[in-house]
Amino acid sequence: MKNRTINERLHDRCWEWFRGMRMDSPEDLLRGTGTDGSSISSSLPWPVAAEALASGARTSAGFRRLKAVCDVVETVGPVDGRFYAGRIRSWDEAVLDDPKIAAIDSWGTPIRWPGPLLGLPRAFSPTTLRYLATALWLKREGYVKPGGTVIEVGVGFGGLAAMNAVVSGASTRMVDLPQVEAAARRMMEECGLGRFCLADDAGIDSGDCCLVSNYAFTELTREIQDGYLEKHLKGAGRGVIVSNAGVFAATIGGRSDQELLSMLRDAGLPAGIDKTADLLGPADHFCKVAILHWKA
């Protein structure tokens, strides 16, 4: 990866200042731990904020501005946002005009960056752009089929599930902490996409579905990874795991990229690893993110 330019550094620095001025952190929503210690995000106040949304203790307005959400889920900066905007324009520019995309971007009142700085006609949340680019890439590469099924490990606020619904008409079985799953389902319902949420594994043809995990699987302990391997990964005919194991493996006691690759192959999955995929943005390359993938 080329060195970051002064322009890019200033861009991200301005974003951090701008974002910090607009983040909200109401103490009454962030008390408690909400954690079982099994993952990086479960040790942060994010699950508490998700539970508040899922239970109806708060509305969705401003949800994506909560510090707890910004620290874990709403994390993409403007330099990466501009990168993803470029990918979207290259792959399917017309989708940017879809009102359903606008509804997803508006949900939770995220902090947006001006359109001209992203190379777009209007402001967007950079995180929204990453989810949209990911959904387009998954469809483009044949991992998520039109009208297909996705098992998503680590669902955030539901952004990728929503984008897969709009881009591919795909339904998603969410796998996360119960309160996070419930919060993401609420988001899907409020965006008119509730019918694309699968409540359980009933009726899922595992051989014809795609297992997707945007970082989350590599932020789990080995024990949890083993359980998910048996329950969700082994039978999935296709899979994409965006891995930041290089950052978190030692911290959480998870596996390195090579250990993950061996785990998948030992389970009979024809897995490969790609560190140059055109989905990976500047921050991914800086953090040595890789994509583990397979197609049976």
Where are these regions (language model features)?
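Conserved Class I S-adenosyl-L-methionine-dependent methyltransferase catalytic core
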Residues: G32-K145
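Conserved class I S-adenosyl-L-methionine
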Residues: P146-G156
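Conserved SAM-binding loop of SAM-dependent methyltransferases across substrates and taxa
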Residues: F157-G169
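Class I SAM-dependent methyltransferase SAM/SAH-binding core
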Residues: A170-L193
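S-adenosyl-L-methionine
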Residues: R186-S206
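A short SAM/SAH-binding and catalytic strip from SAM-dependent methyltransferases
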Residues: C209-E223
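A short, conserved alpha-helix within the catalytic core of class I
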Residues: L220-H232
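Conserved beta-strand signature within the Rossmann-like core of class I S-adenosyl-L-methionine
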Residues: A236-F248
